[in-house]
Amino acid sequence: MNFEPAAVARGTADIAASLGGLEWITDNRVERLSQDFYWFSPILKRQLEGLRADAVVRPKTEDEIRAVVGACAKAGVPITVRGSGTGNYGQCMPLHGGVILDLSAYKQLLWVKPGVGRAQAGIRMMEMDRQMQQGIKGPDGRQGPGWELRCVPSTFRSATLGGLYGGGFGGVGSINYGPLASTGNVLGVRAMSIEPEPKVVELRAPEALLLHHVYGTNGLVLELEVGLAPAHPWLEAIVCFDSFDAALEFGDALASAPGIVKKSVTLLAAPIPDLLLQAVPPLAGTMTAGSHAVIVLVAEFSEAGLQQTVAQFGGTVTYRKTAAEVQASNRTIVEYTWNHTTLHAMKVDKGLTYIQSGFQAGQHVAQAKAMRQRLGDEVLVHLEFIRTKEGAMNCSGLQLIRYRSDERLNQIMQIHRDHGVYIANPHVYIVEDGKQGQVNPDVVATKMRFDPQGLLNPGKLRGWAQREQIMADAAAGRVMLATLPRF
């Protein structure tokens, strides 16, 4: 479908007028709500700057969502679904104007059972954890143990559950449970079709993952049912090392230690700690200047194991706070990990950008050492230890790059590939050019089922232009598609 800007703008205005009882935003806030952290990439900054929706709507109920979706389908107006806009490569930025469907007011925790919870897509993850950590009352009326999400991004204060599912990968906690796509993490989703008379369908795993990490291009997710982790009192610590190799080997040993209950292990090679110390004054004294730092979260009852591992590798604990102290301060070192590291570093050095990499489990330590030796100070090493989907310990990289040119940035990513390191390119906004790597027929078929007019976040899914060939291949038996419920 071609989207003529003036026609889309008129259609959006008509929809807003006809649904005047909903919360519509049409003033200059629309520009801010049309953006995410795309500017982490100098390439995306050039490509996406200035894009904006024609209006933003903030529905509070499923009926309100249904009314907006039905009206957009009748008028042929594109819809871009938004959580809190904490993505990093334009996931929620509309290429063709239209309506931003902001789900941040659709935010109820629906229920919690031992090990499983269900919530509306717009719930903020910090709020979901806060409610679940209070515990569940059993049949005898006693308060049971608390629960928490298995993995959250460093933006957990504002990021939504649906946003992580639609635009994210994993995060803090993935050291135990792997990425969100690991079997057992997402158990089901309730999704709405984009039609004049929208339909609602429950997808159970594994089909529930067909809408995961595709930027809301192939279905509108209303609710998610996810596996939960036991809530522990987390001790936060920073361990500093003079040697990069010692810091890396310590991080790997701690991450791999089965008897130490942990939630996060992050390696920040020099000079990243110095950049953070400059960017965040409250961090003064928490890291040694010029050092390589490992940020860790372990259960308080595992502190002895942490200290033993620190001594084994010759590290120094330069920061330590109990769970009670973290709660009282309302500050957590989680917000210096994952892409918060990138955000803080760029405050000091605006010439930095980053890449996303995945090492090979079992070879990740050797690969990380080899890449640092090969690329030197041009690439600043930031590693997050996680489990793979299959359960092996590994690490993902969010390396900081001293940007010189698009050509050199692409060369650096290719050097990693040539050394067996997977790259999920964060400098592209097309689904297949990033983590997916290729057209996924199941993703396209799912979009055909849920979004037959192609109104959801148009322009982000390359496979949509190949849908007729994909269906022909499926009919001829050349492609096997996932089984989706009929509706």
Describe the residue ranges of each PLM region.
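Conserved glycine-rich FAD pyrophosphate-binding loop
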Residues: F3-E4, R52, V77, S84, ...
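Short amphipathic alpha-helix segments
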Residues: A246-L277, A361-E378, S405-M413
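Helix N-cap motif at beta-to-alpha junctions
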Residues: S243-A246, L297-A304, Q360-H364, I401-D406
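N-terminal flexible segment immediately upstream of the FAD-binding catalytic core
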Residues: M1-G70, T86-V116, I272, L277-L283, ...
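Short amphipathic alpha-helices in soluble, non-transmembrane regions
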Residues: I15, C72, F250-A257, S302-V317, ...
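FAD-binding subdomain of flavoenzyme oxidoreductases
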Residues: L110, M125-M126, Q133-G138, R142-A257, ...
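A conserved active-site cap/scaffold subdomain adjacent to cofactor or substrate pockets
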Residues: S243, L254-S256, V261-K263, L268-K321
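General beta-strand structural signal in soluble alpha/beta enzymes
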Residues: W24-N28, R58-P59, I79-G83, L101-L103, ...
